[in-house]
UniProtKB/Swiss-Prot annotation:
Gene name linked to the record: pepP
EC id: 3.4.11.9
PANTHER family, sorted: XAA-PRO AMINOPEPTIDASE 3, XAA-PRO DIPEPTIDASE
Binding positions for Mn(2+) 1 per the UniProt entry: D275, E398, E438
Cofactor list: Mn(2+)
Organism from which the protein derives: Aspergillus niger (strain ATCC MYA-4892 / CBS 513.88 / FGSC A1513)
Pfam families in alphabetical order: AMP_N, Peptidase_M24
The protein's name: Probable Xaa-Pro aminopeptidase pepP
Domain of life: Eukaryota
Length: 466
């Protein structure tokens, strides 16, 4: 049986990715003599400082190389199916401070490429390929990602308009190796979420919970985060991308403790991301109001996940989650009216204002979702993925219900919408802040595979928090 570790012990499948991108470029006939040229991110210094900025590899380059090194480049010769990686030559002055860089032999062993040269060889290689193509080769590159001095002389055309889109579209469907990386990022993140919940038992501030999450990720091999963690206690959870993470868990004025914490955080492992959200109680038990909302959100998520399979229409899944929210809020008395009328009037958007999820991969909000932020339908405006989900895609499923005054109060002051919300009942729920539950799900031909193992059942979460 193939294990996660055995898959990841192999090389990142850069060559297969290059072939898939070339197919999407639809090069045929004489166009098969084309090349793909990509550059890594450059080493950059902090302004007015001699320290390097935090390095984040360019995703298109990594996708076709698996190489995390800065200041590198690659050429994929489509006709010969040859992938060449170019790495920086040795800089004697840099060796004094940083040690010897990766050698050509080591890079050839580590990465799924046919040849490794130095970046000083790029122009000579380009000239040779152009000559072999008799002036009929097309050079595909990305606008704004070509170093000054790189020469495409002798090529029929330098096309900088289609490669980025071809890579972005190809990235939607993940291969076995990519799924393994995403699973590993999820495994590490699950451990970190558990550590964060356990840390809350002695923490006095949001930052201590964040610190526990970060420390666990680093200790388990994920030094980078997929995005800035969100650690939001009490009403801070009503802010979707709250990021201050520095609020006291007990109000310094009233001495009242916050009831719960929403933590949205995920590790980045070898360039691939996890994106997980959990809500847990402070003090070991959810308040009755938070538990009521939690149960609705969990049902929204479980039913949405159950719908996932190849070619499912994502808008349908999102709409179903809204209907579950409406049913739950009607049962609590927060909403008034019929389910169908509330759905048609989009009243649930006041409490669930964002999309159900997004593609996940090398970016947290991964490529290929084709969102329509100009959509006038408020229920779908912020849906980051539109259309049918292909097998092999990985998508987040993250429904939520929030009690954000800024969003809800316009509904309360409008004659058209105020009649659907019972303000007397609503008053009891402001302190809930927000509840969001988020998992990362691999869509398959048969259905789905949930990559996220962090506990989310109320009983499990309360045990960890006690």
């Amino acid at each position: 049986m193939t294990t996660l570790d055995s898959i990841l012990a192999g090389r990142y499948p850069a060559k297969a990715h290059a072939r898939r991108v070339a197919e999407r470029l639809q090069v045929g006939g004489s166009g098969r003599n084309g090349i793909i040229y990509l550059e890594a991110q450059k080493t950059r210094l902090i302004e007015d400082n001699d320290e390097a900025m935090h390095f984040r590899q360019r995703r298109p380059f990594f996708y076709l190389s698996g190489c995390p090194l800065p200041d590198s480049s690659l050429i994929y010769n489509i006709a010969s199916d040859k992938l060449t990686l170019f790495i920086p030559p040795i800089d004697p002055e840099d060796v004094i401070w940083s040690g010897l860089p990766m050698s050509v032999a080591e890079a050839l062993r580590l990465y799924d490429v046919d040849q490794v040269l130095h970046t000083t060889d790029v122009n000579a290689t380009l000239a040779s390929i152009a000559s072999d193509g008799n002036g009929k080769s097309v050079a595909f590159a990305i606008e704004g990602q070509i170093t000054e001095g790189i020469k495409f002389d002798g090529f029929l055309e330098t096309n900088t308009s289609v490669l980025k889109g071809a890579i972005d579209s190809t990235r939607v469907v993940k291969d076995e190796y990519e799924i393994a990386l995403l699973r590993k990022a999820n495994d590490i993140s699950a451990k970190a979420h558990i550590a964060a919940i356990e840390a809350s038992k002695t923490a006095t501030n949001e930052r201590e919970i964040e610190a526990a999450f970060l420390a666990t990720c680093i200790a388990n091999g994920a030094r980078d985060q997929a995005y800035h963690p969100i650690v939001a206690c009490g009403q801070n959870g009503a802010t979707l991308h709250y990021g201050r993470n520095d609020d006291d868990l007990v109000d310094p004025v009233t001495k009242a403790g916050k009831s719960s914490v929403l933590i949205d955080a995920g590790a980045e492992y070898r360039t691939y991301c996890a994106d997980i959200t959990r809500v847990f109680p402070l003090g070991g038990r959810f308040t009755s109001e938070t538990q009521e909302i939690y149960k609705i959100v969990l049902q929204m998520q479980l039913e949405a996940i159950a719908m996932l399979k190849e070619n499912v229409q994502w808008e349908d899944v999102h709409a179903h989650a809204h209907r579950i929210a409406i049913k739950g809020l009607l049962k609590l008395g927060i909403l008034r009216g019929s389910e169908d009328e509330l759905f048609e009037k989009r009243i649930s958007v006041a409490f669930f204002p964002h999309g159900l999820g997004h593609y996940l991969g090398m970016d947290t909000h991964d490529t290929g979702g084709n969102p329509n932020y100009a959509d006038k339908d408020t229920m779908f405006k912020y849906l980051r993925v539109r259309g049918r989900l292909p097998a092999g895609s990985v998508i987040t499923v993250e429904p939520g219900i929030y009690f954000c005054r800024f969003i809800i109060e316009p509904y309360l002051t409008s004659p058209e919408t105020s009649k659907y919300i019972d303000t007397n009942v609503l008053e009891k729920y402001w302190n809930v802040g927000g509840v969001r539950i988020e998992d990362n799900v691999h869509v398959t031909q048969q259905g789905y595979e949930n990559l996220t193992t962090a506990p989310k059942a109320i009983e499990e979460v309360e045990v960890l928090a006690t």
